[in-house]
């Protein structure tokens, strides 16, 4: 059980790093005419999740899954702002961490 908690804590720490990186990229991004949300709104959602994770609280993983989904809002912003390849790497790590119970 201790090991499971340790792994979960490590996964949460990695998820925080991934979300921080994503937030940094989003903060430098341009708005897409195809998105329903601005980069500032996406950044706010990421900040809320990061703060919750750091506090050890629950967060809206379903909302983040929608943001990170293929052809979702983050991919659109990434494509419009020149970080599509990095988005693919980030989203793969995000999916792995969420599946691990982060």
Give the ranges of each region predicted by the language model:
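Short terminal alpha-helical segments
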Residues: 1-39, 94-101
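Generic structural signal for well-ordered, non-transmembrane alpha-helical segments
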Residues: 13-16, 20, 40, 44-47, ...
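Short, Lys/Arg-enriched charge-dense amphipathic segments
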Residues: 3-11, 46, 51-62, 79-90
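Amphipathic alpha-helical binding modules
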Residues: 63-102
């Amino acid at each position: 059980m201790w090991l499971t908690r340790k792994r979960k804590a490590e996964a949460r720490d990695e998820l925080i790093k991934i979300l921080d990186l994503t937030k940094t990229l989003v903060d430098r991004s341009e708005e897409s005419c195809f998105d329903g949300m601005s980069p500032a709104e996406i950044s706010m959602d990421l900040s809320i999740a990061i703060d919750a994770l750091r506090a050890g609280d629950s967060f809206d993983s379903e909302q983040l899954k929608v943001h990170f989904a293929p052809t979702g809002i983050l991919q659109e912003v990434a494509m419009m702002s020149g970080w599509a390849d990095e988005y693919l790497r980030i989203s793969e790590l995000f999916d792995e961490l969420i599946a691990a119970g982060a």
